[in-house]
Amino acid sequence: METNLDGCFERVEKTLGSMIDSLAKNNPSQKLAEELLAAEAELSKSLKLLETHQNNNARLQQLRQETSLHDTQLKDIMSSLWNMRRELKAVPTTSNPPPGPKHQFTTSELLAYARRISRNTLPLPGVTNGVDMTPTQFSASLTEPEDSFRLQFQPTQTQTPTNSFNLSFNGTVSTPIGLSAPTPTTTNDTQPSTQLPPSQQPPPKTAPADDKLPAHLKPAVNPLHDAAFHPWPTEGQIRTGALAALQRLVDAGIEPRGYDPAEQERRRVAEEKARREAEERARLEREEAERKGREERERMAREREAARLRNAGGADGDGERRESVAVARPKPKQFTFLGADDDEDDEDEDD
């Protein structure tokens, strides 16, 4: 490739030099011009070939890099597949499916749960005020029940006055909606008048009575009027439900399965009764011990008193014997306040 390019460049240089010399000598040659064009075309062809060679070389380098990258990925994949195959072979195989139910609940339990929660999926009749909540009746639900009742029985303009009248709640007859009272026409002066005498004329028209319930009385008639509906139980209902009771048992460390509240209550009552009996027994034993200790103290006090009396009796006998032997001496008088009072009384009497 390099030799070919060098030859093309030399040929172009030689042809170009010859062409310049011929032009300088003012003797241009057509043959030299054709050779110059041929050398230029050959040089262009060689340059295009060089460009193709360089592109192919770059493509080869890129393919080598991609090949090495893919080889690395293939090695990793093969290593992963080999490890997975080894792990799969290490797993023990079973011929039969594992025993036991497939799910933790049965179909009957699922249906029973759906039946219990079905009452919370739709609002109560009092919340909707008897209005159909389907999409087709949504526009009609925007009116009050009393308005819908009144509109349902509203007569049309095609009805006759004899059979299309409304009775208000006060018993008066009102003119149908859309109809007016007949008025005598005066198109013909010769036509006889159809005016009735005053005694046979109908009573004057009165305004229809308002049959709508006042707003402040609607909550009294319907406690669920304008009540908020939630298709799920509230937090208070959940806290007072069975699930909350089971959670409290779990928090207390009690297994809910097989737990019998009646048995636990009976056991608690029995334990309370046993505790009270033990306390009563301990109290009786304590009182008995106190009684025995008190009796023992009283017995010891009586024994000490008897010993003291015996000792005092022996001392009195010895004193009497000594007094009989000794010379009789007058006993000293014992000073008392009563004696002094008697002497003062005697002195007062002498005076």
Swiss-Prot record:
Q: Provide the alphabetized UniProt keywords.
A: Activator, Coiled coil, Nucleus, Transcription, Transcription regulation
Q: Where does this protein have coiled-coil stretches?
A: 30-68, 262-311
Question: So which residues are the signal peptide here?
Answer: none
Give the compositionally biased regions (Acidic residues): 340-351
* One Gene Ontology cellular component: mediator complex
Origin superkingdom: Eukaryota
Report biased composition (Low complexity) as residue ranges. 182-198
Name the Gene Ontology biological process terms: regulation of transcription by RNA polymerase II
Per the record's keyword annotation, is Oxidoreductase included, yes or no?
no
List the biased-composition ranges (Polar residues).
163-177
Recall the GO molecular function terms of this protein's record.
transcription coregulator activity
Quote the InterPro entries the UniProt record gives: Mediator_Med4
UniProt region (Disordered), positions on chain:
156-217, 256-351
Q: How does it assemble?
A: Component of the Mediator complex.
Q: Which family does it belong to?
A: Belongs to the Mediator complex subunit 4 family.
* Known function: Component of the Mediator complex, a coactivator involved in the regulated transcription of nearly all RNA polymerase II-dependent genes. Mediator functions as a bridge to convey information from gene-specific regulatory proteins to the basal RNA polymerase II transcription machinery. Mediator is recruited to promoters by direct interactions with regulatory proteins and serves as a scaffold for the assembly of a functional preinitiation complex with RNA polymerase II and the general transcription factors.
Q: What is this protein called?
A: Mediator of RNA polymerase II transcription subunit 4
In its UniProt entry, the species of origin is given as: Chaetomium globosum (strain ATCC 6205 / CBS 148.51 / DSM 1962 / NBRC 6347 / NRRL 1970) (Soil fungus)
